[in-house]
């Protein structure tokens, strides 16, 4: 059976972010690294005890029937690993006839480890989406825009990447996502989301934080990112305030921290 995320590609707009076929069920989906995407307080579902081990006669063993409707949905959720936050995936495809806000497409939200991997395995990696496109992953109800109330006083850590390796680009983006949904930072409450920009000369990954004046939080997040992403000496992390980015572009934007 195809997942809900795969069926969604038939009506999502735009369609170019989805793979053309569902992954083989024989291959399975990759397991999230425990260091980055450990679920928050996963519920413990214990197996039923063997009546012979408990000493109870087999005839007294209660029989159960599969739940239906809403009960089935709730039961299924017990076997998933919940995340601490609900996250929303956005996709932007460049269209000069539309405003920036209208180009942003809210795709879907998820709140478990399993639903994250189901979504991730059915969309194209960043290296395969169109030039001028963006993926954004933000906490639910935060739009990937400077003007959003949750973002306008904040800033972002920016990693600029050359075009040499598609694999490195895809792996780096996945590691960023796992850091976000796995709450890998001491100041995870300051995290708003992350964006990857696919452009002609270079690509950018940015991690957005809520308060650009919170130096302690910004630096802790920056150092954790550098360690988690295993960035080399040629890849610097630069922290920029959104208010500066809104009035200047490219290399003209002042960086208040560099790691």
Curated annotation (Swiss-Prot):
Localisation: Cytoplasm, Cytoplasmic ribonucleoprotein granule; Cytoplasm; Nucleus, Nuclear body
Pfam families: IF4E
GO BP, one annotated term: translational initiation
GO molecular function: eukaryotic initiation factor 4G binding; RNA 7-methylguanosine cap binding; RNA cap binding; translation initiation factor activity
PROSITE patterns hit by this protein: IF4E
Residue spans of biased composition, Basic and acidic residues class: 41-51
Compositionally biased tracts (Polar residues): 18-27
Mutagenesis or variant effect for residue 117 to A: Disrupts interaction with cup, eIF4G and mxt
Region of interest called Disordered, as start-end residue ranges on this chain: 1-70
InterPro entries, per database record: TIF_eIF4e-like, TIF_eIF_4E, TIF_eIF_4E_CS
SUPFAM superfamilies to which the protein is assigned, alphabetical: eIF4e-like (SSF55418)
Superkingdom in the source lineage: Eukaryota
Keywords: Cytoplasm, Initiation factor, Nucleus, Phosphoprotein, Protein biosynthesis, RNA-binding, Translation regulation
Cellular component GO terms, alphabetical: cytoplasm; cytosol; eukaryotic translation initiation factor 4F complex; muscle cell postsynaptic specialization; neuromuscular junction; neuronal ribonucleoprotein granule; nuclear body; P-body
Residues annotated to bind mRNA: 100-101, 146-147, 199-204
PTM note: Phosphorylation increases the ability of the protein to bind to mRNA caps and to form the eIF4F complex.
Residue ranges, compositional bias (Low complexity): 54-70
Tissue occurrence: Expressed at the posterior end of developing oocytes (at protein level). Preferential expression in the pole cells, at different developmental stages.
General function of this protein: Recognizes and binds the 7-methylguanosine (m7G)-containing mRNA cap during an early step in the initiation of protein synthesis and facilitates ribosome binding by inducing the unwinding of the mRNAs secondary structures. In 0-1 hour embryos, forms a complex with me31B, cup, tral and pAbp which binds to various mRNAs including maternal mRNAs, and down-regulates their expression during the maternal-to-zygotic transition.
Family: Belongs to the eukaryotic initiation factor 4E family.
Subunit structure: eIF4F is a multi-subunit complex, the composition of which varies with external and internal environmental conditions. It is composed of at least eIF4A, eIF4E1 and eIF4G1. Recruited by cup in oocytes and in early embryos, preventing the interaction with eIF4G. The interaction with cup therefore prevents the translation of key transcripts such as oskar (osk) and nanos (nos) in some regions in the early embryo. Interacts with mxt. Interacts with 4E-T and Thor.
Name of this chain's protein: Eukaryotic translation initiation factor 4E1
Taxonomic classification: Eukaryota, Metazoa, Ecdysozoa, Arthropoda, Hexapoda
